[in-house]
Amino acid sequence: MDISVIRQKIDANREKLASFRGSLDLEGLEEEIAILENKMTEPDFWNDNIAAQKTSQELNELKNTYNTFHKMEELQDEVEILLDFLAEDESVHDELVAQLAELDKIMTSYEMTLLLSEPYDHNNAILEIHPGSGGTEAQDWGDMLLRMYTRYGNAKGFKVEVLDYQAGDEAGIKSVTLSFEGPNAYGLLKSEMGVHRLVRISPFDSAKRRHTSFTSVEVMPELDDTIEVEIREDDIKMDTFRSGGAGGQNVNKVSTGVRLTHIPTGIVVQSTVDRTQYGNRDRAMKMLQAKLYQMEQDKKAAEVDSLKGEKKEITWGSQIRSYVFTPYTMVKDHRTSFEVAQVDKVMDGDLDGFIDAYLKWRIS
């Protein structure tokens, strides 16, 4: 690596470190760590196991933030010392480049940690896909998005599970609900909340005309045991029905599918993928809890954007992102203006650039 490039990277890292320091209250962080450590030494600390686990997790996260920042400062000092030696001893070049690479890796990870610092960012996620305007074409578009998000989740190491699948009339889907289990699943996937627009030559049109279709994506955090949502049994109406897999496969001869209606709000959720009625009811209850909690948060104006974003009509002019297959190829996010020409890569689950741009756009 050329020495001028090395100097530029070191200068850029110095500025980035200063920016990190500006966003952190190191003294306050030290005080919070000390308070939690003292709390964990109290004799009755583990009497409430759920609260204790939450405190322990919070302490580990604070310590990780604090220690990682100081690790970056140490590495920055080391590379600046090595740069001084480089003028007299070229043998330190490889060590300097290796230290720079390690620092870049830590900084990238640390920056993502700062971007994912909002409530519920660390939770698992529930993602729903609802085709809108466009009929069969839109339902096929929904199926394409299902494939895209499944591939993204698998690439991230998330456990991706189908909670409910409603096949389209001729092709694609009428709706699908997915769960993503893994670190920061909601924090990453919340960027996908909104209307997604497709422009292509429709394979369902014998005249080979260009069609525009829309599909809505909703994302909610899956609630853990530290967040309680009270649901009275009297407020729930449960219906059961025969369920099957994607495309109508493995249709059950007994009514294992479960549909729950929350009478006071009219919210309806359903699960069809488990082989037992009990399993589907448990999944549906988790979905209902997430929806009720999100609805309650939406009543607080300050939290609307942080949990759900703007809910728009599934039609022209409301899209957050456009996927153009013809007459040129492009995927563009209309919130951040981030765009790429490799539409096939995006459809294969390469969403990192869009998600990173969205997270930076939110905090700016």
Swiss-Prot record:
Q: Which residues carry this modification: N5-methylglutamine?
A: 249
Localization per Swiss-Prot or TrEMBL = Cytoplasm
Superkingdom classification of source? Bacteria
How does it get modified after it is made?
A: Methylated by PrmC. Methylation increases the termination efficiency of RF2.
Protein biosynthesis: is it a keyword of this entry? yes
The signal sequence is: none
Q: Which GO terms describe its cellular component?
A: cytoplasm
GO terms (molecular function) for this protein are:
translation release factor activity, codon specific
Keywords attached to this entry = Cytoplasm, Methylation, Protein biosynthesis
Methyltransferase keyword on record: no
Q: What does this protein do?
A: Peptide chain release factor 2 directs the termination of translation in response to the peptide chain termination codons UGA and UAA.
Query: Family per UniProt?
Result: Belongs to the prokaryotic/mitochondrial release factor family.
- Its name, as the record gives it, is Peptide chain release factor 2
Q: Which organism is it from?
A: Streptococcus pneumoniae serotype 4 (strain ATCC BAA-334 / TIGR4)
